[in-house]
Amino acid sequence: MAAVFDLDLETEEGSEGEGEPELSPADACPLAELRAAGLEPVGHYEEVELTETSVNVGPERIGPHCFELLRVLGKGGYGKVFQVRKVQGTNLGKIYAMKVLRKAKIVRNAKDTAHTRAERNILESVKHPFIVELAYAFQTGGKLYLILECLSGGELFTHLEREGIFLEDTACFYLAEITLALGHLHSQGIIYRDLKPENIMLSSQGHIKLTDFGLCKESIHEGAVTHTFCGTIEYMAPEILVRSGHNRAVDWWSLGALMYDMLTGSPPFTAENRKKTMDKIIRGKLALPPYLTPDARDLVKKFLKRNPSQRIGGGPGDAADVQRHPFFRHMNWDDLLAWRVDPPFRPCLQSEEDVSQFDTRFTRQTPVDSPDDTALSESANQAFLGFTYVAPSVLDSIKEGFSFQPKLRSPRRLNSSPRAPVSPLKFSPFEGFRPSPSLPEPTELPLPPLLPPPPPSTTAPLPIRPPSGTKKSKRGRGRPGR
């Protein structure tokens, strides 16, 4: 993993290969002089005219001028996310998502700077069909730019909000793709730590992509732990809350909370404020609705084990243990990885520029990248050395061997009211929480009696949480930097 944005990219001056022998005078002798001496070079050769276009050919010069702003996709405290079209250089006309971060806001805190570095490095190094791809990265005097593949299917949150709850086969598909993505991150020593519906995007074909790697932790392999308090409360594992040290098992707790959310309409532990929500996560009872199948019930309970060593996926097997659970018995994992399994929902898009799956609060705004007039100190700019990056080949490096023409299957919809959005409580990694001394260490608690079954007239499972007629603002939605 590159450190502090360090990348081995060729510059316009070229790069010298290490260990290559220097040319002798004879080797460097021009071809014309060899022929004048009556000598012909041995083997194949090619005469190359030295011009500005044939010498010092390096990575494409990339900058804001290469992109036309089309729409605003998101906005947050650190900057904006735009839909853009490339108007210069290679991939002319291609649509991307451009994340713009303000340096001045990031460098105020060392941990924000470190998390920005981590996100940049992870996006550059991790290639997987279910992880968003970085195409370019560059910077100006006051801003950082990440050019990502544009995922026009929108957030999984939007679709979950629209449906209310998912049927188990629908949830199984999304959970399986997320499992493969998490397993790949873990194999690289990376903990994701912010799994939630808002950070899961859908491609135009309907497959998931994990996004927003600002809270990831690198270099956490088997046996290592970290203690940073970060994430979104409703999906955070109890060992993060009590600060007992955590490892990659926290991602499996979050996946269990997400699974519960998909199947019931809300995360497993919620309350009217942060403190009570935390208390419930640490020592609350888990209530499972009766309409869940035995396999779904069993997997949720194994994901939400409070002891990380007893949690499914928490052992050396990691994702492989999750994949072997009976809930996924009908899943062909090789076909899933190759995009040969039909998604349960395929976004209805009119064109590459279609933003109908995004929040209209943002897409209706006029896209403007404000002037870059911030002057940072030399020491502040040192934090972003080596940020620039151009992908060796856009898309091809992660798509070899995969089929990208899945068959269209009509989505199965529920006749339930729209789900009232959860308000994720996004904490900065340095914001502390000290649990009450009365709270015990996390232990597995028995389940309460089953909830009463849905009314006989119901044609589909009902969410546990009653739908609300008013929408709550979704804190953290569209936050490009964190």
UniProtKB/Swiss-Prot annotation:
Which parts of the sequence bind ATP?
L73, G74, K75, G76, G77, Y78, G79, K80, V81, K99
Record-level GO cellular component terms = cytoplasm; nucleoplasm
Give GO terms: molecular function aspect only.
ATP binding; peptide binding; protein kinase activity; protein serine kinase activity; protein serine/threonine kinase activity; ribosomal protein S6 kinase activity
Q: Per its UniProt record, what Pfam families does this chain match?
A: Pkinase, Pkinase_C
Query: What residues form the catalytic site here?
Result: D194 (proton acceptor)
Q: Give the highest taxon in the source lineage.
A: Eukaryota
Give the AGC-kinase C-terminal domain ranges. Answer: 329-399
Task: Kindly indicate whether the keyword Lipid biosynthesis belongs to this entry.
Answer: no
**What compartments host this protein?**
Cytoplasm; Nucleus
SMART domains referenced in this protein's UniProt entry, alphabetically: S_TK_X (SM00133), S_TKc (SM00220)
- What ranges does the record list as Pro residues composition bias? 437-466
Per the record, the GO terms for biological process are:
negative regulation of insulin receptor signaling pathway; positive regulation of translational initiation; signal transduction; TOR signaling; TORC1 signaling; translation
Basic residues bias (residue ranges): 471-482
- How is the protein altered post-translationally, as described in the entry? Phosphorylated and activated by MTOR. Phosphorylation by PKC within the NLS in response to mitogenic stimuli causes cytoplasmic retention.
Q: Which reaction does it catalyse?
A: L-seryl-[protein] + ATP = O-phospho-L-seryl-[protein] + ADP + H(+); L-threonyl-[protein] + ATP = O-phospho-L-threonyl-[protein] + ADP + H(+)
| Residues bearing PTM Phosphoserine | S15, S417, S423, S473
The entry's keywords: ATP-binding, Cytoplasm, Kinase, Nucleotide-binding, Nucleus, Phosphoprotein, Serine/threonine-protein kinase, Transferase
Acidic residues bias (residue ranges): 7-21
Q: Motif (Nuclear localization signal) spans which residues? A: 471-477
Provide the residue span(s) of the region labelled Disordered.
1-26, 407-482
Q: Where is the Protein kinase domain?
A: 67-328
Renumbered to this chain, the signal peptide range is none
Q: Does the keyword Disulfide bond apply?
A: no
Describe the function of this protein: Phosphorylates specifically ribosomal protein S6. Seems to act downstream of mTOR signaling in response to growth factors and nutrients to promote cell proliferation, cell growth and cell cycle progression in an alternative pathway regulated by MEAK7.
Family indicated by similarity: Belongs to the protein kinase superfamily. AGC Ser/Thr protein kinase family. S6 kinase subfamily.
Q: What is this protein called?
A: Ribosomal protein S6 kinase beta-2
